[in-house]
Amino acid sequence: MAIAIEHVIAASSIKGVGRQFLLRCIDDCSDASEINYENFVAFVAPEKHKRICRGVGSCNPEIEMKELKKAYDHTLKLLERSADEKIFYIGSNSSKYPRRLRRCKDHPLFLFYRGNLEICDTMRCAAVIGTRQPSADALKAEKKICDYLAEYGWNIVSGLAFGCDETAHRTAVEYWKNTGKGTTTAILADGLDAGSIYPKENAELADEIVDCGGLLLSEYIIGTSCRPYYLTERDKWQAQLSDIVIPVQTGVAGGTFHALTRAAELDIPSFIPYLREYDSPDCEQIDLCRKGMKKAVEKYKCRSFRTVLELDRMLKPGCSA
């Protein structure tokens, strides 16, 4: 039976409907499928009965059908609102789906996006990430790194968080405004509507990213608030979407290492700046970041560099899209 991607999105909101079921259904999705409630019920009913057998959901058919109708109607309303806000969606079976994201079996089953989705495949992508509280030296180094990447036409990928993420996006946006080179992609752990973007202080930056030829990307429908688990997944996708990963600065724990773990799993090269402050007399915060850099190098095989020129030399042998 041909299935519409809208049906899969609606089914994903039903408690107890598993990823493996949805993953199988994605392959059967077709743009030619008619979007209607009858087709949705025919598609999801077999899984509904399995849920009851597992003790998930009610054995009352009337209650079960009300749940399906609610999920279907609510999803279609949200998708209509998405279109009004120029937020689009695709399934992982689409030819437009970013090819790098398919590198792991746990890739998002569908994506919501605002902006230019093509840059994920037509440009080299560099994940520039790090702590929410970078030092002045780290921010200075990061701006130089991002200017370099933008100059050579990289798409700078980050997560719109405060600190290193925000600096990566802002530097890319400013460079694009001044030169027309480079761009940036923000992967979010929430819906792409203005009311859901986290942190809300960066909602305006999100609009600037789109206006400058960039992209906002999420696996969550509008109206979805950020949650800790979503942030962990977001960290992984940043690396998975990229050709290289650059953790500007980090402590010994945090989301940066989720990204580095995924990079190591996929043999994605990673590079970390060795900052001058790491040679300074000990200070608790600097010592923590020094240890974070050491962990990235020793455990995750990050290659350290002191200048952009060194990074350039490291990238010359390969790392093409």
Language-model features, listed with the residues they occupy:
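Glycine-biased, small-residue-rich flexible motifs in mid-sequence functional cores and linkers
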Residues: M1-I5, S92-A321
